[in-house]
Amino acid sequence: MFNKKNVFLIGTGSVNIDQFLKIYKKDSPIVAADGGANHLKKLNIIPDKIIGDLDSLENKEYWEEKTEVIEISDQDSTDLEKVLGNTDAPFYFAFGFAGDRFDHTLQILHVLSKYRDKNIIFFAGADIIFRLPKQWRVELPIETRISLYPLHKTKIIASEGLKWTVDEL
Protein backbone atom coordinates (compact mmCIF):
# COMPACT_ATOMS: atom_id res chain seq x y z
CA MET A 1 0.00 0.00 0.00
CA PHE A 2 1.26 3.49 -0.88
CA ASN A 3 4.47 1.99 -2.28
CA LYS A 4 4.88 4.85 -4.77
CA LYS A 5 3.86 7.79 -2.55
CA ASN A 6 5.32 9.28 0.58
CA VAL A 7 3.09 8.73 3.60
CA PHE A 8 2.33 10.99 6.53
CA LEU A 9 2.03 9.28 9.90
CA ILE A 10 0.24 10.84 12.86
CA GLY A 11 0.72 9.53 16.38
CA THR A 12 -1.10 10.21 19.61
CA GLY A 13 1.57 12.54 21.06
CA SER A 14 1.86 16.29 20.62
CA VAL A 15 1.80 17.47 17.02
CA ASN A 16 3.04 20.88 15.94
CA ILE A 17 0.00 21.60 13.78
CA ASP A 18 1.55 24.61 12.00
CA GLN A 19 4.61 22.55 11.06
CA PHE A 20 2.43 19.66 9.92
CA LEU A 21 0.20 21.86 7.76
CA LYS A 22 3.25 23.48 6.09
CA ILE A 23 4.48 20.09 4.92
CA TYR A 24 1.26 18.12 4.39
CA LYS A 25 -0.21 18.03 0.89
CA LYS A 26 -3.95 17.32 0.74
CA ASP A 27 -3.57 14.49 -1.78
CA SER A 28 -0.82 12.77 0.24
CA PRO A 29 -1.62 9.45 1.88
CA ILE A 30 -1.98 9.72 5.64
CA VAL A 31 -2.16 6.99 8.25
CA ALA A 32 -3.09 7.51 11.88
CA ALA A 33 -1.46 5.37 14.52
CA ASP A 34 -4.36 4.72 16.89
CA GLY A 35 -5.32 7.98 18.65
CA GLY A 36 -3.42 10.05 16.11
CA ALA A 37 -6.76 10.12 14.31
CA ASN A 38 -8.04 12.37 17.11
CA HIS A 39 -5.63 15.09 15.92
CA LEU A 40 -6.81 14.67 12.34
CA LYS A 41 -10.47 14.96 13.28
CA LYS A 42 -9.79 18.45 14.66
CA LEU A 43 -8.30 19.37 11.26
CA ASN A 44 -11.15 17.77 9.27
CA ILE A 45 -8.70 15.33 7.68
CA ILE A 46 -9.81 11.75 7.12
CA PRO A 47 -6.84 9.35 7.18
CA ASP A 48 -6.52 6.61 4.58
CA LYS A 49 -6.15 4.12 7.43
CA ILE A 50 -6.12 3.97 11.21
CA ILE A 51 -3.89 1.21 12.55
CA GLY A 52 -3.19 0.21 16.14
CA ASP A 53 -4.58 -1.43 19.24
CA LEU A 54 -7.17 1.38 19.32
CA ASP A 55 -6.86 1.97 23.06
CA SER A 56 -6.68 5.76 22.56
CA LEU A 57 -8.93 6.17 19.52
CA GLU A 58 -11.95 8.30 20.35
CA ASN A 59 -15.30 7.41 18.76
CA LYS A 60 -14.29 4.25 16.89
CA GLU A 61 -17.74 4.00 15.28
CA TYR A 62 -17.33 7.45 13.68
CA TRP A 63 -14.06 6.38 12.07
CA GLU A 64 -15.34 3.00 10.90
CA GLU A 65 -17.91 4.87 8.79
CA LYS A 66 -15.22 7.11 7.24
CA THR A 67 -12.10 5.01 6.62
CA GLU A 68 -10.39 1.66 7.04
CA VAL A 69 -9.74 0.86 10.70
CA ILE A 70 -7.30 -1.97 11.39
CA GLU A 71 -7.25 -3.19 14.97
CA ILE A 72 -4.13 -5.12 15.96
CA SER A 73 -4.51 -5.95 19.62
CA ASP A 74 -1.14 -7.56 20.36
CA GLN A 75 0.93 -5.74 22.95
CA ASP A 76 4.29 -6.96 21.65
CA SER A 77 4.62 -4.00 19.30
CA THR A 78 3.86 -0.30 19.48
CA ASP A 79 1.21 1.39 17.36
CA LEU A 80 4.01 2.89 15.26
CA GLU A 81 5.44 -0.57 14.59
CA LYS A 82 1.96 -1.82 13.71
CA VAL A 83 1.66 0.98 11.13
CA LEU A 84 5.11 0.36 9.65
CA GLY A 85 4.44 -3.37 9.43
CA ASN A 86 1.23 -2.76 7.47
CA THR A 87 2.33 -0.05 5.04
CA ASP A 88 5.04 0.47 2.47
CA ALA A 89 6.24 3.82 1.19
CA PRO A 90 9.41 5.48 -0.13
CA PHE A 91 9.37 7.94 2.80
CA TYR A 92 7.37 8.46 5.97
CA PHE A 93 6.88 11.87 7.57
CA ALA A 94 5.98 11.15 11.19
CA PHE A 95 4.37 13.57 13.64
CA GLY A 96 3.21 12.93 17.20
CA PHE A 97 5.62 10.16 18.15
CA ALA A 98 8.38 11.92 20.11
CA GLY A 99 8.82 14.58 22.71
CA ASP A 100 5.99 14.12 25.19
CA ARG A 101 7.69 11.32 27.07
CA PHE A 102 11.29 10.20 27.11
CA ASP A 103 10.32 6.55 26.58
CA HIS A 104 8.51 7.55 23.39
CA THR A 105 11.65 9.29 22.14
CA LEU A 106 13.70 6.18 22.93
CA GLN A 107 11.10 4.13 21.10
CA ILE A 108 11.58 6.06 17.85
CA LEU A 109 15.33 5.48 18.08
CA HIS A 110 14.55 1.78 18.44
CA VAL A 111 12.27 1.96 15.40
CA LEU A 112 14.96 3.68 13.32
CA SER A 113 17.37 0.91 14.26
CA LYS A 114 14.90 -1.93 13.70
CA TYR A 115 13.30 -0.71 10.46
CA ARG A 116 16.43 0.14 8.47
CA ASP A 117 14.56 -0.51 5.24
CA LYS A 118 12.10 2.30 6.00
CA ASN A 119 12.96 5.96 5.44
CA ILE A 120 11.32 7.78 8.33
CA ILE A 121 11.63 11.41 9.33
CA PHE A 122 10.25 12.19 12.78
CA PHE A 123 9.19 15.77 13.49
CA ALA A 124 9.50 16.59 17.19
CA GLY A 125 8.95 20.28 17.85
CA ALA A 126 12.03 22.14 16.60
CA ASP A 127 13.88 18.87 16.01
CA ILE A 128 13.85 16.35 13.22
CA ILE A 129 15.12 12.84 13.79
CA PHE A 130 16.13 10.46 11.03
CA ARG A 131 18.63 7.76 10.17
CA LEU A 132 21.43 9.02 7.96
CA PRO A 133 22.06 7.31 4.65
CA LYS A 134 25.47 5.75 4.03
CA GLN A 135 26.71 8.99 2.51
CA TRP A 136 25.38 12.31 3.64
CA ARG A 137 26.37 15.89 3.05
CA VAL A 138 24.54 18.93 4.27
CA GLU A 139 25.24 22.63 4.45
CA LEU A 140 23.61 24.38 7.37
CA PRO A 141 23.68 27.96 8.63
CA ILE A 142 26.33 28.73 11.24
CA GLU A 143 25.11 28.03 14.80
CA THR A 144 22.66 25.37 13.64
CA ARG A 145 22.36 22.68 16.29
CA ILE A 146 23.02 19.16 15.02
CA SER A 147 23.44 15.94 16.97
CA LEU A 148 24.81 12.70 15.61
CA TYR A 149 23.97 9.57 17.55
CA PRO A 150 25.16 6.20 16.23
CA LEU A 151 22.57 3.42 16.46
CA HIS A 152 24.90 0.83 14.94
CA LYS A 153 28.61 0.48 14.28
CA THR A 154 29.44 3.39 12.04
CA LYS A 155 32.37 5.32 10.71
CA ILE A 156 32.47 9.02 10.01
CA ILE A 157 35.44 9.70 7.79
CA ALA A 158 35.40 13.48 7.91
CA SER A 159 33.39 16.37 9.23
CA GLU A 160 33.84 20.01 8.51
CA GLY A 161 32.66 23.16 10.24
CA LEU A 162 31.37 21.53 13.41
CA LYS A 163 32.18 23.01 16.81
CA TRP A 164 33.48 19.58 17.86
CA THR A 165 34.97 17.37 15.18
CA VAL A 166 33.59 13.88 14.81
CA ASP A 167 36.22 12.63 12.36
CA GLU A 168 36.97 8.92 12.66
CA LEU A 169 34.03 8.43 15.05
Which positions does each model-derived feature cover?
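Short active-site oxyanion
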Residues: 5-7, 25-30, 46-48
